[in-house]
Every structure is written in C-alpha cells, then in structure tokens.
C-alpha cells in the first residue's frame, strides 16, 4: 500500500494506482473507501473497459446490481477492452442478482462463447438454470465449472442443490462429502442456504 500511495503522490491522477488502491482497500475490508477509489478511477478513465468493469463488479458485490449493469455496458462499449468475456460474465451474474434472468442468460452465453471456461459465467449459468428448475442443464454447467477452477463452498452447495433437484441422492451425497472435507465451516450451514 505504501508503494501505491507513493505512486499517487507522484501522479494523483494515476488510474492504475487508484485501481490498485481500491483492491487493497477492499481486501482489508474498507468497503466504502474501495468504492470511492473505484468510482474515482472510473471517472478519470471513462473509456477504459477494465476500469469500468472493476467498478461495476464492486457495485454488484455491494448491493447495487442494477447500477452495476450500466457500468458493464460502458465497459463493453470499449472496443479496445481486452477482456470482454469478463465484463459479460460479470454483467450476466449481476443481471441474475438484479432479477433480470433474460439479460443474464444472454450476457452469460456471450461470455461463454468468448471464454468457454469462465468460472463465474459457468457458475452463474448453473444458478440460472437451477432457478428455472432446468436441473440437467444446471448439472452440465456446474460440472464444467468444477472442471474449470477449484471448488468453492458456494459452488459445492449449488451442486448439492442441483443433484437434489434431479433426485440423485448419491451425487448429492458425494458433493456433501466434498463440502465437509474441503470447507468444514461451510458444511455446518444448511446446504440450501445459498439462494438460487
């Protein structure tokens, strides 16, 4: 953090340094400061897709999914943005949180067209399909998600819910065992605790 602050003393308008400061602030739990830094970076670089995507992701994670969608749209308008799959995946997951399943499906499918192994997009598609009770489709997405990146407690809980929806007690039990082994603290919570 000291190096970032030193860089900002040299150039108070350094978007990259401000973005890094936002990451540091968020990691240490200073949510308000992180949000202010992300917003400052976005205002200083209104055409940079990476910066706009980061601010949108922060907004979505902090309870403003509808507002976040406008920032993802702005990020995607940057034709030089090197990671549109990231912004599309974030937009899709955020649209799901905002209660816009049709937009979510469209953005997530576009993200997966660009990056078929995007873990967040795969998890969000599994969540979307499970919410629609399309459990076979949800299973396919959760299996791809588990192959693409290490499991998290929420992913394993979602896998349990999907297998329960399919009536496959054996597969649900396997995921439950993994949850207990890999995330003992999360395993004590109700497996259905994470909303679809």
What do these predicted regions represent?
Residues 17, 51, 85-87, 121, ...:
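TPR alpha-solenoid repeat register
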Residues 10, 43-45, 78-80, 114, ...:
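Structural marker of alpha-solenoid helical repeat scaffolds
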């Amino acid at each position: 953090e000291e190096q970032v602050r030193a860089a900002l003393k040299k150039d108070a308008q350094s978007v990259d340094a401000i973005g890094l400061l936002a990451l540091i602030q968020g990691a240490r739990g200073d949510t308000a400061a992180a949000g202010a830094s992300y917003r400052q970076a976005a205002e200083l670089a209104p055409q940079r897709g990476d910066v706009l995507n980061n601010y949108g992701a922060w907004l979505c994670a902090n309870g403003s999914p509808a507002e976040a969608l406008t920032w993802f749209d702005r990020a995607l308008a940057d034709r030089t943005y090197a990671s549109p799959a990231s912004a599309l995946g974030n937009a899709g997951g955020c649209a799901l949180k905002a209660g816009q399943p049709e937009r979510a499906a469209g953005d997530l499918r576009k993200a997966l067209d660009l990056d078929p192994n995007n873990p967040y997009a795969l998890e969000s598609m599994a969540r979307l399909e499970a919410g629609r009770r399309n459990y076979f489709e949800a299973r396919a997405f959760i299996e791809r998600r588990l192959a693409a990146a290490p499991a998290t407690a929420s992913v394993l809980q979602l896998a349990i819910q999907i297998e329960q929806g399919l009536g496959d007690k054996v597969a649900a039990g396997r995921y439950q065992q993994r949850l207990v082994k890999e995330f003992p603290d999360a395993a004590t919570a109700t497996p259905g605790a994470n909303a679809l």
